């Protein structure tokens, strides 16, 4: 039996000043970054002081915001004088954020030792989960400034939408691992390290990495471990903040099976972690543009094709009818996909966002997307063509 989902009222969520963090999450390539920017713009138009933290945005999105070069610090987006709020935007610079953490939690001498370490410069920021960990760290920094009354977060692109929640723990697990503890062995030089219990393994690593790189890795681990308690404590504190009232997770999904499957996983995980879920943005849908049934459109097109009169008007009418029928088939497929999601998640509110016929390349286009996201009557069934 088909379940009609509740409508996600994003306008009310953005206008509610008790909400301080909105996290846009979901699989890669579903429109999270553009959605985050549109929500941030709308919140500023509601009178709020907003910063949107983006992850690797397309160049045209930066241009849409009126900023040529997004950086690791918030930059104010120029808005019309009548807009009562403020919008600031920034892009996560993973390396600079890592550098800031090292300097914050280490003394000057130790911090410089870490920053100059060759292993840190070439490998550290490539560790699995580092980007998500740094996104969490940057969110914590923004929250601690108490400068913004709303922070909108675009989570890192990933093949697995759960990485944003799992990465801080995974990076922590790596730093608790046997290899990490081996490199950390107190009072040992690299020569003694290689002749210890794990000598064969370390020799193999030395062959692959080179002895100097292995020495740099050991020095990096030993320097960083003294400060990692601060890293872990900060990440745990930020993670806890995401569970508090005032945070809203918005799961974004395209109208595709894999993206909706990821969305379902994320909804389940948020429930398990007791994290506040606002609802689902069902993005880039193709609703029917008129009430003409698909079968009648096909019949009418075939009738026109059969006419002996071969005019441009007849050919154009037949082509329009076929386009309508094709769009109708797409809409039916999207409705089936949404029905599966709502059947498995009947309590999750949904807003449907039709695919725009233009690129989001300026503030007006971003505002048009914000209109779709915050229009209360824009329920998922209508947006998907139901």
UniProtKB/Swiss-Prot annotation:
Keywords: ATP-binding, Hydrolase, Nucleotide-binding
Tree of life domain: Bacteria
Classification via InterPro entries: Anion-transp_ATPase-like_dom, ATPase_ArsA/GET3, P-loop_NTPase
EC number: 3.6.1.-
Activity regulation note: The ATPase activity of the BagAB complex is not stimulated by antimonite, an arsenite substitute, suggesting that BagAB is not a transporter for this family of elements.
Family per similarity comment: Belongs to the arsA ATPase family. BagA/BagB subfamily.
UniProt name for this protein: ATPase BagB
Gene: bagB
């Amino acid at each position: 039996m088909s379940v009609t989902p509740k409508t996600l009222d994003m306008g009310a969520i953005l206008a509610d000043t008790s909400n301080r963090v909105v996290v846009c999450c979901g699989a890669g390539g579903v429109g999270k970054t553009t959605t985050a920017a549109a929500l941030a713009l709308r919140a500023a138009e509601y009178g709020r002081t907003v910063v949107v933290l983006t992850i690797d945005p397309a160049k045209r999105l930066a241009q849409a915001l009126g900023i040529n070069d997004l950086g690791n610090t918030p930059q104010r987006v120029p808005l019309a004088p009548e807009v009562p709020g403020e919008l600031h935007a920034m892009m996560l610079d993973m390396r600079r954020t890592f550098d800031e953490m090292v300097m914050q939690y280490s003394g000057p001498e130790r911090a410089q030792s870490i920053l100059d370490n060759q292993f840190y410069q070439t490998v550290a920021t490539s560790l699995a989960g580092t980007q998500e960990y740094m996104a969490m760290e940057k969110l914590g920094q923004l929250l601690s400034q108490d400068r913004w009354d709303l922070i909108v977060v675009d989570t890192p692109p990933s093949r697995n939408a759960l990485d944003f929640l799992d990465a801080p723990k995974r990076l922590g697990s790596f730093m608790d691992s046997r290899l990490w503890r081996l490199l950390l062995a107190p009072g040992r030089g690299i020569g003694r390290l290689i002749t210890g219990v794990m000598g064969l393994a370390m020799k193999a690593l030395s062959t692959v990495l080179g002895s100097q790189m292995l020495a740099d890795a050991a020095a990096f681990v030993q320097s960083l471990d003294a400060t990692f308690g601060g890293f872990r404590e900060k990440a745990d504190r930020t993670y806890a903040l995401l569970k508090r009232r005032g945070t809203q997770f918005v799961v974004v999904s395209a109208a595709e099976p894999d993206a909706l499957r990821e969305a379902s996983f994320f909804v389940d995980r948020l429930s398990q972690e007791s994290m506040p879920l606002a609802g689902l943005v069902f993005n880039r849908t193709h609703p029917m543009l008129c009430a003409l049934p698909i079968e009648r459109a096909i019949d009418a097109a075939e009738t026109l094709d059969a006419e002996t009169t071969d005019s441009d008007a007849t050919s154009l009418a037949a082509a329009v009818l076929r386009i309508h029928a094709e769009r109708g088939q797409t809409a039916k497929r999207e409705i089936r996909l949404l029905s599966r999601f709502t059947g498995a998640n009947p309590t999750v509110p949904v807003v449907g966002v039709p695919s725009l016929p233009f690129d989001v390349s300026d503030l007006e286009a971003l505002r048009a997307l914000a209109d779709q996201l915050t229009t209360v009557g824009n329920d998922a069934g209508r947006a998907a063509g139901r």
